Amino acid sequence: MTQKVEFPPRHVTEEKLMEFARAVHTQNKIYHSTAAATSSGYPGLVAVPTFGAVWVGQILEYIISSDLNIDYSHIVHGEQHFLYKRPIFAGDILRPILRIKRDRAFGNARQIVLEVTLLSEGSNDDVLVMTITLIVRGKA
């Protein structure tokens, strides 16, 4: 398997940001209203801090179809960390880059550590770095 995989960029829309904010039941108006966000000094509607998780589905689909030989029914989510360089805003065009940081066996299981970096399509700057730890259980 390639250790670094680039995915197509995705445009972040106000609609998706507001939909996600409603789904996680946040009350902060900067996640629901462009006017509230701009009056708070932001350039536009702000993404809820966990919004980066919307890219995880695409990453998991790739991992399952890769040569890592993973059965989706055996994956357990270990942990996930978000390191923001700046907030995600409506209008951003973000390109995810996946790196497999670790793939090690222990007992009848594996630990796979993924790093997903969201790059700004315009500046190529890091916006968010997510570290995702998956545990792949062995067959019973």
Swiss-Prot record:
Domain of life (superkingdom): Bacteria
Pfam family of the protein (one)? FAS1_DH_region
SUPFAM superfamilies recorded for this chain? Thioesterase/thiol ester dehydrase-isomerase (SSF54637)
Report the CDD domains cross-referenced here: R_hydratase_like (cd03441)
What family does this chain come from, according to its entry?
Answer: Belongs to the UPF0336 family.
Protein name according to UniProt? UPF0336 protein TWT_721
